[in-house]
Amino acid sequence: MTKKLNRFVKSERLLNRRINRAERQAISVGKGFLNVKKYNRFLRVLGPGLVTGAADDDPSGIATYSQAGASFGYGLLWAFPLMYPLLLAVQESCARIGAITGKGLAAVIKENYSKKLLYMSVGLVVVANTINIGADLGAMAATTQLFVDVPFALLACLYALIIVLLVIFVSYKHYAKILKWLAITLLAYPVTALLVGQNWPEVFHATFTISPKLDFQTIYIFVGMLGTTISPYLFFWDTSEQVEEEVAKRNLKKIGEVPNATKRYLHNLRLDNFVGMTLASLTAWFIVIACASTLYANGITQINTAADAARALEPLVQGFPDAGLVAKLIFSVGVIGLGLLAVPVLAGSSSYAISEALGWKEGLYRKFKRAIGFYAVIIASTLVGLAINFLGIDPIKALVFTAVFNGIASVPLLFMIAKVGNNKTIMGDYKNGALSNVVIRLAFVIMTAAVLVLFVSFASIG
């Protein structure tokens, strides 16, 4: 009897242990399922902010950050902690303007300010974008020439044609989802920076210790870094895309309809913006570090060709046969993919601005025949940008010049963003907070000062 009782007790204990283990596994699976759901919800939040962040590291940005690393080593890393909060605040304000008004930036300026301010704002962004389109198309053609012996002009025309056809016949939302994955090639820079072996105390010291020099070349590249990070086209694109995203989700019937901006919606907007701008800034920081430790460290202080820029990635593929060719391939895929992503953003940004200023129907969600003027501006911007490549301008130098011009053009536009974002009549209870006001105004002051110093140093050379 005692033996039977003992066997029963042991069986019961074993059964309890198995039940407990099964419960723990069930809880674990449940938690995993919840984590997957949370992860999926997080991915659904990411939209215009992520695309804007990816487009921020366009070919012009890659060239400018690469030149900063090659020319000055770690010497300009201090710019990133300065630019990062400015970028976050400015782009959050732009996205919020779109979310609250249901309109693009140009439409808001048109309704609330003078025509002089409207045409100045639109004119600046269109000129800056057109130059940027030309430089990006040139960079895509130049990197392709690393592999095929095809005339530069023919390649530039081919890419312009591909982009125009994609914009007209394929939903930008669909092909942007694919092209965003090509941005993964930018991870080659952080990996290269880690593989080369950095003096990390020196890197962080250079990052958090401001040590500006006032010679023309340093100021020129610094203004370029500001301009390619805080770019005019991002202001107009992010504002309009925030509205178009809501139209695509059927939360709005059309652009111009006032959205129901809940606290959750604005929280998601800020999260999307934060993720996009943080990834863009971190990637840019690593590009400078990678080029400093590969190009600058080996005496290559001037990037004259796409092949020069690609050499920064050679340590990543050192063990591969034909490492130089593989490095060029990784670099080219990144430049071409990001160019295909960025050029429609640039042309679309110009088109939103012009269409809103003239009262045309606009939106990438509309079919071509329902927004002919809007798509005509996209086509014209791309073709005029293409034409710049026939002026005999060096494509690599054009990329850096584009970034500098963006820095100059951003100054008056930042003033307008601060003005609109702080206007209670326009924004109601969602106007800029105290911190947002301080940071956006600081962005205006810093970029104005940098541009003025650039002009003064240029005049002193002459």
Locations of the language-model features?
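Flexible loop linkers connecting adjacent transmembrane helices
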Residues: 64-69, 92-117, 142-145, 249-252, ...
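Hydrophobic transmembrane alpha-helices that form the core helical bundles
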Residues: 96, 100, 118-149, 156-160, ...
